[in-house]
């Protein structure tokens, strides 16, 4: 499935590094830090990184999800400050990435470094129907850990 997404380059330095799929099977597109200079994230610190780009999905049956890059998280403890970013179809502002250094070492974010990935996902908008009781299920109200460890 392919959709067309409108993209604005808000900072001309990003014109040559717009998001592209790295391989035919890639699900995510890398977003880069649109910075004038390096930013050092101290342990436990968060920083809102501009990307210099804006997108407009327009179609409410799609959204964009921002996710951490696996290498940054695993090797350096750098994840998203909000864990997952959600870009609604009607948002038209600059894409910004909240980076969080959850490691015990400072981490330097360099200008134009790949900092997150963006995945376009289908959305279902639910209509809720109020009921007094649910039809029974085998799980019922069993929650946290109720299905066992393995």
UniProtKB/Swiss-Prot annotation:
What's the EC number here?
3.6.1.23
Quote the pathway field: Pyrimidine metabolism; dUMP biosynthesis; dUMP from dCTP (dUTP route): step 2/2
Matches recorded under InterPro entries: dUTPase, dUTPase-like, dUTPase-like_sf, dUTPase_trimeric
Extract the GO molecular function terms from the UniProt entry: dUTP diphosphatase activity; magnesium ion binding
Which superkingdom does the taxonomy of this entry point to?
Answer: Bacteria
One GO term (biological process): dUMP biosynthetic process
Has the keyword Magnesium been applied to this entry?
A: yes
Task: Give a yes or no for keyword Lyase in this entry.
Answer: no
Catalytic activities: dUTP + H2O = dUMP + diphosphate + H(+)
Quote the record's binding site residues for substrate: 69-71, 82, 86-88, 96
- Which UniProt keyword terms apply here? Hydrolase, Magnesium, Metal-binding, Nucleotide metabolism
Q: Which cofactor does it need?
A: Mg(2+)
Q: What class of enzyme is it?
A: hydrolase
Q: Which family does it belong to?
A: Belongs to the dUTPase family.
> What role does it play?
This enzyme is involved in nucleotide metabolism: it produces dUMP, the immediate precursor of thymidine nucleotides and it decreases the intracellular concentration of dUTP so that uracil cannot be incorporated into DNA.
Q: What is this protein called?
A: Deoxyuridine 5'-triphosphate nucleotidohydrolase
Upper classification of the source organism reads:
Bacteria, Pseudomonadati, Pseudomonadota, Betaproteobacteria, Neisseriales
